[in-house]
Structures are given as structure tokens and as C-alpha cells.
């Protein structure tokens, strides 16, 4: 009994160590490919549209209603302490520091991460990646580099737009439903907002973009065989990206806002 438990734990530990080592080497190869030609500009532009522009509606809807419900719930809670004037400040700080980057990251992980993993996994199953080797083309440079660099660039843009839309959602609820004065609400919104609040959110967005793209590419690149392998790669990409987004969010928050 004890031998079986020790054997199982040992196998899982070795497998985990192998996965960490494989992922580290894959990440290093992807990052180092940035400085090596060619740039594949056409692929980068295509990924800019897919990861950035096509993700904008999802991020916009998510942040708009998050800002709206945050304003509504803050009013319900703060009205008990006669602190309704702080609602706008809470909305803008919550969105720029936490909700904007995290929600955008989770939405992009679900939409883009799954698609990237499924696409590359399908290429692995159909031996298209092997065909790239025969054409003297580096698969990591051709498949991974455009997606990673594009995700790092587009995520801060998506988060910045999402923050603005989320604040707008809170503004509409505050002014038109809760009967706040428009000028007073806007003044309260920007009164305590500092550059570090926005910068920290954009840094998080860039890190989240790297996490989503590199994990999704890795999951697809090393997927199993057949349809089951593609499905597992897709699930692994979304789940692992989401978990690492939440973990890195705390670490970056700790780095920027030490208590």
C-alpha cells in the first residue's frame, strides 16, 4: 500500500518536473526567437486582428457590465454608511487596478487561448508541424513568435479600452439610475486616480498576454494524438492560463502596492 502511494507520488513528481523543464525550454526558445529574423509581418498583422480587434467586443461587454454592476453594488453597500460619494472612486480604481486586466485576461484566455491551442494541436496531429521542419522553417518562430509578440502588444490596448468602457458603464448607472450629478461623479472619478493605478493594470495586461499565448502555444505544440489530444490541449490551455493569470495578478499587485 505504502509502496504504491510512494510510486504514484514519485511518478507524478517526475512528470511535473519534466513538464516544467519542457515548458521552460519552450518559453526560452519562443522569447529568443524575437531577435532572430524573419519577422513574419503578415502573420503578426493577422494575429493583431484576431487577438486584438476581434476580442474587443467580448472585452467591451465584460468591462461595461462589470463597471455598471460595481457601481450599483457599491451604492447598495455604501449607502448604509452614507459614503455614496466614494462610488466613482471605487469603480475606477477597481477597474484599472484589478477587474479590467483580470476580466480581460480571462475572456481572452477563453476565446483566443482555446483557439490557438486547437489550431496548433490540429497542425501537430495532421503533421503540418513536421512539414515545416522539412521546409527548413522553425515552427516556434513561425507559429509561436507572432502569437506571443502580438498578445503582449494587444492586451494592454484591450485593457485600456476596457477600463474606459467600464468607467462609462459605472457612470451611466451612477448618473441615470442612481441620480448622481454628472460633473460631481466625473470629478470623483479622477480625483484619486493616479498614473500608477493605470500603469499597474497595463503591466498586468502585458504579462497576461504572454501567459495566455505561451501556454496556449505550448499546449497545442505538445498535444496528444487524435481528436482527444486536441480537446485536452484546448482545455489545458484555458485552465492553466486562467490559473496563472490569477496567481500572477496577486504577485504583480504585491509588487506595485506593497502594504
From Swiss-Prot:
The UniProt record lists the keyword Manganese: no
Lineage: superkingdom: Bacteria
GO cellular component, one term: ATP-binding cassette (ABC) transporter complex
Listed Pfam families: MlaE
Membrane topology listed for this record: Multi-pass membrane protein
Keywords assigned: Cell inner membrane, Cell membrane, Membrane, Transmembrane, Transmembrane helix, Transport
Homology family: Belongs to the MlaE permease family.
Protein name in the entry: Probable ABC transporter permease protein RC0129
Species in which this protein is naturally found: Rickettsia conorii (strain ATCC VR-613 / Malish 7)
Amino acid at each position: 500500500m505504502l509502496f504504491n502511494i510512494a510510486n504514484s507520488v514519485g511518478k507524478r513528481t517526475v512528470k511535473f518536473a519534466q513538464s516544467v523543464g519542457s515548458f521552460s525550454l519552450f518559453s526560452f526558445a519562443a522569447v529568443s526567437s524575437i531577435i532572430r529574423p524573419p519577422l513574419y509581418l503578415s502573420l503578426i498583422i493577422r494575429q493583431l486582428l484576431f487577438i486584438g480587434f476581434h476580442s474587443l467586443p467580448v472585452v467591451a461587454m465584460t468591462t461595461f457590465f462589470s463597471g455598471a454592476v460595481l457601481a450599483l453594488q457599491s451604492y447598495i453597500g455604501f449607502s448604509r454608511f452614507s459614503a455614496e460619494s466614494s462610488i466613482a472612486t471605487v469603480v475606477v480604481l477597481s477597474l484599472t487596478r484589478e477587474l479590467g486586466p483580470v476580466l480581460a485576461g480571462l475572456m481572452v484566455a477563453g476565446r483566443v487561448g482555446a483557439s490557438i491551442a486547437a489550431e496548433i494541436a490540429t497542425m501537430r496531429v495532421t503533421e503540418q508541424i513536421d512539414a515545416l521542419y522539412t521546409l527548413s522553417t522553425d515552427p516556434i518562430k513561425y507559429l509561436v513568435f507572432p502569437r506571443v509578440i502580438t498578445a503582449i502588444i494587444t492586451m494592454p490596448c484591450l485593457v485600456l479600452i476596457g477600463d474606459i468602457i467600464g468607467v462609462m458603464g459605472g457612470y451611466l448607472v451612477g448618473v441615470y439610475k442612481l441620480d448622481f450629478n454628472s460633473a460631481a461623479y466625473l470629478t470623483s472619478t479622477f480625483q484619486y486616480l493616479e498614473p500608477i493605478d493605470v500603469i499597474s493594470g497595463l503591466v498586468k495586461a502585458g504579462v497576461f498576454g504572454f501567459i495566455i499565448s505561451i501556454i496556449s502555444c505550448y499546449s497545442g505544440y505538445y498535444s496528444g494524438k487524435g481528436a482527444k489530444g486536441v480537446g485536452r490541449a484546448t482545455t489545458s490551455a484555458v485552465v492553466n492560463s486562467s490559473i496563472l493569470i490569477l496567481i500572477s495578478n496577486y504577485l504583480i499587485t504585491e509588487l506595485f502596492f506593497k502594504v
